[in-house]
């Protein structure tokens, strides 16, 4: 093949390819830093930064590894997980919002590594002619069945979802999102898991009756939320593909991206029926927390989440035949399910709050 690009352009392209190919190294190095306890040591030295000698003394590593720690931190500083303050020849480190988050929720980093070997067999899946998700085709069972078979996997998944719900709930019940719940008297959290999100909403809004709706075996394991003892919080077992309890607002946090368009329309139709049955004046709404993929971003910046959205889209495609959707794709779902309008509030990093109206 004769290239139309100059040698300089090809060299630059090579570097760009390397940059994407090596991103897994950041994940592995960050996990290593957490396992060594580096964020904990720096946190204990706060509010001031931690010098490299003080960090090394606390880690109690063999002297042969001291320069390796410096080089590990150099990469993680560049990736934005630590901040470097250099005074003459001494390196001093402090936490950034990203590492503070990992200190609070260390499972944020854990994405299941290669998800049962799915990624390494992806090209094999592309060559198949059936419609099974990559995970199902490669594992011989659904991703969820594979998770249930491995004793460590499902608890790890629910721990990650619980940590995420705690973080998202803090934003949802803040003044920043107060308008979302204005005029809502009852709320049904569909696929609400063990009730962490609903418990936060019920605690912040005593006037809202909150119902956690999920599979019976899921809501049965809701000790943490039940222990709070909120009188306006209840748990109901069932399936969103049959009938959803009535409510002024129906909440689906990170649910639709697990499903293809056909199943999403079924879920949304049941949500519309539940809202319409509750509010005869059609003031009700469905509240979605999901990614809205933006593919028009040209210049990357700290608030550009295009890469994580696109990676998440492929993750859902491979694991469960789901997808992350653009605004146009969401609009098509809403129209097909019989809704009249929607509003998007980009308030949760790579995710958005979408209010959908009957």
Question: How would you describe each model-predicted region?
Answer:
Residues 2, 107-305, 341, 347, ...:
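Conserved adenosyl
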Residues 2-186:
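Conserved Class I S-adenosyl-L-methionine-dependent methyltransferase catalytic core
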Residues 21, 353-358:
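C-terminal lobe and adjacent flexible extensions of AdoMet/dcAdoMet transferase-like proteins
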Residues 33, 50, 64, 214, ...:
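Eukaryote-biased feature marking scaffold/signaling PDZ-domain proteins and nuclear chromatin regulators
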Residues 39, 43, 56, 123, ...:
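Amphipathic alpha-helical interaction motifs in eukaryotic regulatory proteins
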Residues 75, 200, 204, 333:
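Rossmann-fold NAD(P)-dependent oxidoreductase module
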Residues 287-337:
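C-terminal alpha-helical "lid/dimerization" subdomain adjacent to the S-adenosyl-L-methionine
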């Amino acid at each position: 093949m004769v290239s139309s690009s100059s040698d300089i352009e090809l060299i630059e392209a090579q570097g760009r390819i390397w940059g994407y190919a090596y991103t897994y190294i950041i994940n592995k190095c960050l996990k290593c830093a957490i396992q060594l306890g580096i964020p904990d040591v720096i946190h204990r030295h706060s509010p001031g930064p931690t010098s490299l000698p003080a960090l090394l003394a606390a880690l109690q590593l063999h002297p042969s590894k001291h320069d390796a720690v410096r080089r590990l931190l150099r990469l993680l500083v560049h990736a934005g997980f630590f901040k470097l303050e250099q005074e003459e020849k001494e390196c001093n480190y402090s936490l950034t919002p990203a590492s503070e988050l990992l200190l609070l929720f260390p499972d944020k980093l854990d994405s299941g590594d290669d998800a049962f070997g799915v990624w390494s067999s992806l090209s094999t899946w592309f060559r198949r002619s059936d419609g099974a998700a990559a995970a199902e085709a490669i594992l011989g069972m659904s991703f969820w069945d594979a998770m249930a078979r491995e004793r460590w996997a499902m608890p790890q998944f629910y721990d990650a979802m619980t940590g995420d719900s705690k973080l998202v709930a803090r934003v949802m019940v803040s003044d920043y999102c107060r308008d979302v719940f204005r005029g809502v008297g009852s709320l049904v959290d569909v696929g609400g898991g063990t009730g962490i999100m609903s418990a936060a909403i019920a605690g912040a809004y005593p006037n809202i009756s909150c119902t956690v709706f999920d599979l019976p075996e899921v809501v049965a394991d809701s000790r943490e939320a039940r222990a709070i003892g909120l009188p306006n919080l209840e748990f109901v077992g069932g399936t969103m593909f049959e009938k959803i309890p009535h409510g002024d607002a129906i909440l689906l946090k990170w649910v639709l991206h697990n499903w293809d368009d056909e199943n999403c329309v079924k879920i949304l139709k049941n949500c519309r029926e539940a809202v319409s049955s509750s509010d005869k004046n059609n003031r009700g709404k469905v509240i979605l927390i999901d990614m809205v993929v933006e593919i028009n971003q040209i210049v990357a910046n700290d608030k550009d989440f295009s890469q994580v959205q696109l990676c998440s889209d492929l993750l859902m495609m491979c694991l469960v035949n789901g997808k992350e959707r653009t605004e146009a794709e969401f609009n098509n779902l809403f129209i097909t399910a019989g809704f009249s309008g929607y509003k998007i509030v980009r308030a949760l990093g790579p995710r958005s709050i979408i209010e959908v109206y009957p």
